[in-house]
Curated annotation (Swiss-Prot):
EC number: 1.2.4.4
Keyword Transit peptide belongs to the record: yes
Protein name: 2-oxoisovalerate dehydrogenase subunit alpha 1, mitochondrial
Organism: Arabidopsis thaliana (Mouse-ear cress)
Gene Ontology biological process terms in this record: branched-chain amino acid catabolic process; cellular response to sucrose starvation; response to absence of light; response to sucrose
Localisation per UniProt entry: Mitochondrion matrix
Pfam family of the protein (one): E1_dh
Induction (UniProt): By dark treatment. Down-regulated by sucrose in a hexokinase dependent manner. Up-regulated by Leucine and its derivative alpha-keto acid (KIC).
Length: 472
């Protein structure tokens, strides 16, 4: 690559000649564009061409040299023109404060009693949509409870709940288009549930049987569905963010009427991939909605030990990304914010960051005991007094769309369906152990063949170390 560029007169001319990017690498009008738009401006915004952006781009050195004197004469006396941007100057030495004196407010629509706050700005939700949202939130609660108990009974090896974050799961999913591509972390099964992933499919993945789309190779809760535009979950934290920027950019290049949506927790923002993903999406103006679940805890690490900034929302502005802080326990606020962000990302071809303020009621996973690092009273308070499902239910009931009879019937049916799904998943055979060595290379190399043979010999020598009915 370096040799190729060295042979070119300039980087720009090289790209133009070799990649046919003459329409991209042109001078831009760097005049100020408004950060915020009125409703009428947003509604009339045309679809932006992938190559019609206003972002700053490099120009040829020779072009800069030819017009240097002219540029200096034209620059306002109060501004300095640097390659990094045109900026004003001051004779006063003043450091930017580490934070604003006032914290960024949190957008909400419903109060704690499920009543709409007067003069709230939100997108109306129909009875049909509201009822479905609540049904899915309640089903997610039941699913989490039963799978968690199944792990405690030794029927599955691992589980991780979304207790306390049901509104973020379901309301955000409801605000998206089925064509939008989701790159999740590991606490968003509700998004997949909303899109049509069945309870049987959830159970098959958790049990790692032959019906599991991942062929039993992944640990439980690492779901994925190509059919539902839901990338398979990966364990490494934050790797999905740069990937989401790339997927979003590909949607932009293909002029798709869709965006990428990716999730991460507050702890994940300490990973380098968080910053790389945001910067990548901002520079390339990729239609990506970044949703951060700020639930206060990164396993046992409190947010006070994660960052000193005003949460996550302020990090978006640093990368040139529009951002908003939302009450993640308010389903109406989550729905309105995500739907608005989604429209902004698609119509304006830009990334958006949403910080969802919430609380992780459950343990980090079945491998964790959170009472060792936080008070039981604190957990109970958020479980009972700040429960997002109960809060949304009050609003649905106040509208006359839900009753106690509906509640009892829904939870009873969900429980029966889940128990049946678990029983069916247990009856499926497990994948043979040698399946581990397939789908890695087109032609299996000698070293893998040797490892496979060694594993077979080990199982033969020590069969007591493997469960009954285990297939090699």
């Amino acid at each position: 690559m370096a040799i190729w560029f060295a042979r070119s007169k300039t980087l720009v001319s090289s790209l133009r000649h070799n990649l046919n990017l003459s329409t991209i690498l042109i001078k831009r009008d760097y005049s100020h564009r408004p950060i915020f738009y009125t409703t009428s401006q947003l509604s009339s915004t045309a679809y932006l061409s992938p190559f019609g952006s206003l972002r700053h781009e490099s120009t040829a050195v020779e072009t800069q040299a030819d017009h240097l004197v002219q540029q200096i004469d034209e620059v306002d006396a109060q501004e300095l023109d640097f390659p990094g941007g045109k900026v004003g100057y001051t004779s006063e030495m003043k450091f930017i404060p580490e934070s604003s004196s006032r914290r960024i407010p949190c957008y909400r629509v419903l109060d704690e009693d499920g009543r709409i706050i007067p003069d709230s700005d939100f997108i109306p939700v129909s009875e049909k949509l509201a009822v479905r949202m609540y049904e899915q939130m309640a089903t997610l609660q039941v699913m989490d409870h039963i799978f968690y108990e199944a792990q405690r009974q030794g029927r599955i090896s691992f589980y991780l709940t979304s207790v306390g974050e049901e509104a973020i799961n379901i309301a955000s999913a409801a605000a998206l288009s089925p064509d939008d591509v989701v790159l999740p972390q590991y606490r968003e099964p509700g998004v997949l549930l909303w899109r049509g992933f069945t309870l049987e499919e959830f159970a098959n993945q958790c049990f790692g049987n032959k019906a599991d789309y991942g062929k039993g190779r992944q640990m439980p809760i690492h779901y994925g569905s190509n059919r539902l535009n839901y990338f398979t979950i990966s364990s490494p934290i934050a790797t999905q963010l740069p990937q989401a920027a790339g997927v979003g950019y590909s949607l932009k290049m293909d002029k798709k009427n869709a965006c990428t949506v990716t999730f991460i927790g507050d702890g994940g923002t300490s990973e380098g991939d968080f910053h790389a993903g945001l910067n990548f999406a901002a520079v390339m103006e990729a239609p990506v909605v970044f949703i951060c679940r700020n639930n206060g805890w990164a396993i046992s690490t409190h947010i006070s030990e994660q960052f000193r900034s005003d949460g996550i929302v302020v990090k978006g502005q640093a990368y040139g990304i529009r951002s908003i802080r939302v009450d993640g326990n308010d389903a109406l606020a989550v729905y309105s914010a995500v739907r608005s962000a989604r429209e902004m990302a698609v119509t304006e071809q830009r990334p958006v960051l949403i910080e969802m303020m919430t609380y992780r009621v459950g343990h980090h996973s079945t491998s964790d005991d959170s009472t060792k690092y936080r008070a039981a009273d604190e957990i109970q308070y958020w479980k009972m007094s700040r429960n997002p499902v109960n809060r949304f239910r009050k609003w649905v009931e106040d509208n006359g769309w839900w009753s106690e009879e509906d509640e009892s019937k829904l939870r009873s049916n969900a429980r029966k369906q889940l128990l049946q799904a678990i029983q069916a998943a247990e009856k499926w055979e497990k994948q043979p152990l040698t399946e581990l060595f397939n789908d890695v290379y087109d032609v299996k190399p000698k070293n893998l063949e040797e490892q496979e043979l060694g594993l077979k010999e080990l199982v033969k020598k020590q069969p007591q170390d493997y469960p009954p009915g285990f297939h090699v």
